[in-house]
Amino acid sequence: MSKPRLIASLAATVGEKYVLTEERRTAYYRSGFRSGSGGAAAVVFPATLLEQWKVIQTCVEANCAIIMQATKTGLTEGSCPSGFDYDREVVIVNITRIRKIILLDGGKQVLALPGATLHELEQLLKPLGRAPHSVIGSTTIGATIVGGIANNAGGALCKRGSSYTELALFGQVDAEGHLNLVNHLGIRNLGETPEEIFANLEKGEIPDEDLEGMDKLASDRGYGDRIRNLDAKVPNRYNADPERLYEVSGSAGKVAAFAVRVDTYPIPKRKKVFMLGSNRAKDFVALRDHILSNFKELPEMCEYMNRGIFDTAERYGKDVFLSIKYLGTEKLPKAYAIKSSAEYFLNKIPFLPKFLPDLFLYYLSRLFPQHLPKRLLKYRDRFEYYLILSMSDEGIDEARCYLEKEWSRLEGVDFFECNEQEQEAALLHRFAAAGAAIRYQNLHQTTTEEVLALDIALLGNDKEWVEELPDEITEHLELALYYGHFMCHVFHQDYIFKKGTDIEAMKKKMLRYLDAKGAKYPAEHNVGHMYDADSTLKNFYESLDPTNTFNW
């Protein structure tokens, strides 16, 4: 099928308005959230499940490479094309217009269509006293429920593990190149044909008596037990864990998801955030061991930051912090799209500095007063390592008692209970940390190389959780920034190297060090185009997509 005929066929399905082909208009969708970009013949926006099905049918018939895309919040370039040297036309299928969420069993589960976001689910569930899998970070920037499932998204919450379900509806291209619809939703009376199934789902009415599949998992229900195993010789969670790879779950877009069925969670009646500081890594090891061994209630979350990322996020993540606090989360995805389009246009003007919007936002944020509360800043000055420990209900008293009577007796440690302002600021600051390294590098392009970001899962029994890099690496480093999900032993490590450093050589050395520790990577960001998939993932991807049609 010729390119003009392909574009015409796609437009006939979704309307010309929803088929983008101009470079300027597709720039945002062809680029990654942090990095990465490539070429595409078209970006298509179906509005219904049937339109999505027909678009994919057209692409399969035309022998296109299909990239399934949602809100493009992935951090490893997996939601955009990689380069401009594909051997066939690339079509990006963006499913953000298909956003229905259906409550099941009084809200204990939901059925989500592919474009439905975690933020929308959070708002829908709040009156019912329930919450989605993730409630910070991914919800803030508009990530979809399906995207989380497809990438084993971990999130910050200690009780929930990776996003996971065994109940899904998806399109799959078999070894003969035929597109098939696989219905494993566990719901009766949806119909037999794609048209019938899609129509019944989009009506949004599913009686409880039609629900089956109760023997299948709609979340990682065993995670609370796994995280407590302090002798574990495997990480608690990581992207290539064979126990968490199942059809759409962990598929990374190698099938086309049309709907997933997932569990929801009760909202705690009370929450309290504690800020902890120490200059010795072993003090936090003692805390982790005690909490996971003795507490009846697991923490809601326990987020780690080192001083380097605290300082960098304070300065270079300030605009993100202020945007979320004062503009809210709903406008952020659109704001990112506008920023990306502006960058694409401005970067084509030779005499202008690259990433001009980043420069503007950085200097604009500097006009605002200090955004972090005084007690957080005092801890930054006193300590090298920080934990943001969030407890709920009975766990609040457990934590308070342990911190006051035992942990605080350790030499050189301290903690305080956050008030509401401090709690909000601490969590927003931790979220703003995720983009701080990129912003720093964008503003220091003449003296630094691109950011090397590693997403790491340490073994459950690893006590040496603070990295000690050899001189052959540190002599080339400008900044080493560490943050992550401490109880889960999942860490995000952003390295900014001096100009002229061989980044690939540095990455190989670091990965060899991690391999020697038995660590797994990536932990929760998926391989995208930035990591090599191990044999477990490769075999899984090949079983899902033997013709390599999806998400190159």
Regions found by a protein language model. Give the residues of each.
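Short, structural beta-strand-to-alpha-helix junction motif
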Residues: T48, T73, K108-Q109, A116-L121, ...
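Conserved glycine-rich FAD pyrophosphate-binding loop
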Residues: F33-S35, A41, T71, T76-R88, ...
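Anion (oxyanion) recognition and catalysis
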Residues: V60, K126, D515
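General beta-strand structural signal in soluble alpha/beta enzymes
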Residues: Y18-E23, F45-P46, I66-A70, E77, ...
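N-terminal flexible segment immediately upstream of the FAD-binding catalytic core
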Residues: M1-V60, G74-V110, V262, I309-G317, ...
